[in-house]
């Protein structure tokens, strides 16, 4: 429907390069036309992601972008276009929803946000040997009509046992809202500070958060029944607002220390206890 319908394009892709590395992307675009003039809405989301899972080094990362634009019409100019259409244009014109005059043109609200998230860790530990006994009845070992028992094979392999992890997590995010109108009727708003027939207003929020931690991992020996993690986090926030003269900027700092005690392995009991305390005022 090219008059008031909706359209959507959506795509997702993910691939494993090998047993350690993977990456992909996603796209989602939605467009709606609306039933009245200047009422269309569009929404666009897109992102890329990747991961690397090795014995010692592990990483996950994602970037996402979100954009939403909503055209505004301020409502119809006169309710009689709907309640008493015969009174409009001296009854010489029939109105449809897409031809009814509206209050605003070239006016929109736009929200745009993106974030980058990265978490990675480096694990220290030791290598130990594991022994596997291959069953003599395995298809690889079976010999038809053989009456002599075969000896079982013993396979010795090495596995990495992590003991301690050094962790870093980072998130960068920016969100912006913008209202713009290039064509307004005079007196549209009670208070006009700059221009009575045009508007331009925006608000921006920006933040960077870093978390550094060290973890003693669960299960590296029979006495390590739970994992213990200690961390420190710092977050920087910046806000930009418009006022009557210029843009005003506000900065904030947040600093926290915390810890986690968790048991995630086994079948009998699982628990997760977290605690943190702020040590810096905003």
Language model segments and positions:
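Repeated loop/turn-to-beta-strand initiation elements of outer-membrane beta-barrel proteins
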Residues: 20-23, 56-61, 126-130, 176-177, ...
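Membrane-embedded beta-strand positions of outer-membrane beta-barrel proteins
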Residues: 25, 50, 59-61, 166-170, ...
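Outer-membrane beta-barrel translocator domains and adjoining extracellular loop/strand segments
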Residues: 36-42, 72-78, 132-135, 179-185, ...
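Outer-membrane beta-barrel translocator/receptor signature
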Residues: 1-37, 41-44
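Outer-membrane beta-barrel translocator/channel fold
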Residues: 34-45, 49-112, 282
């Amino acid at each position: 429907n090219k008059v008031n319908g909706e359209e959507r394009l959506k795509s997702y892709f993910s691939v494993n390069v090998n047993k350690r590395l993977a990456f992909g992307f996603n796209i989602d675009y939605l467009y709606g036309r609306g039933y009245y003039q200047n009422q269309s809405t569009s929404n666009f989301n897109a992102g890329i992601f990747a991961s690397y899972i090795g014995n010692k080094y592990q990483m996950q990362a994602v970037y996402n972008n979100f954009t939403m634009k909503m055209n505004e019409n301020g409502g119809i100019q006169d309710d009689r276009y709907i309640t008493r259409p015969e009174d409009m244009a001296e009854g010489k014109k029939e109105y449809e929803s897409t031809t009814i005059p509206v209050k605003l043109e070239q006016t929109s609200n736009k929200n745009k946000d993106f974030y980058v998230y990265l978490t990675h860790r480096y694990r220290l530990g030791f290598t130990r040997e594991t022994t596997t006994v291959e069953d003599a009845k395995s298809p690889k070992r079976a010999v038809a009509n053989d009456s002599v028992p075969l000896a079982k094979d013993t396979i010795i392999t090495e596995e990495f046992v992590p003991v301690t992890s050094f962790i870093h997590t980072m998130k960068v995010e920016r969100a912006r809202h913008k209202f713009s109108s290039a064509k307004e009727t005079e007196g549209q708003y009670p208070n006009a500070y700059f221009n009575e027939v045009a508007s331009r207003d925006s608000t921006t929020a920006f933040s960077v958060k870093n978390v550094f931690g060290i973890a003693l991992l669960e299960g590296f020996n029979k006495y390590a029944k739970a994992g213990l993690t200690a961390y420190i986090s710092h977050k920087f926030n910046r806000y930009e607002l418009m006022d009557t003269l210029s843009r005003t900027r506000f900065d904030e700092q947040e600093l926290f220390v915390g810890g986690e005690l968790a048991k995630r392995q086994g079948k009998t009991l699982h628990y997760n206890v977290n605690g943190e305390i702020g040590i810096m005022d905003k």
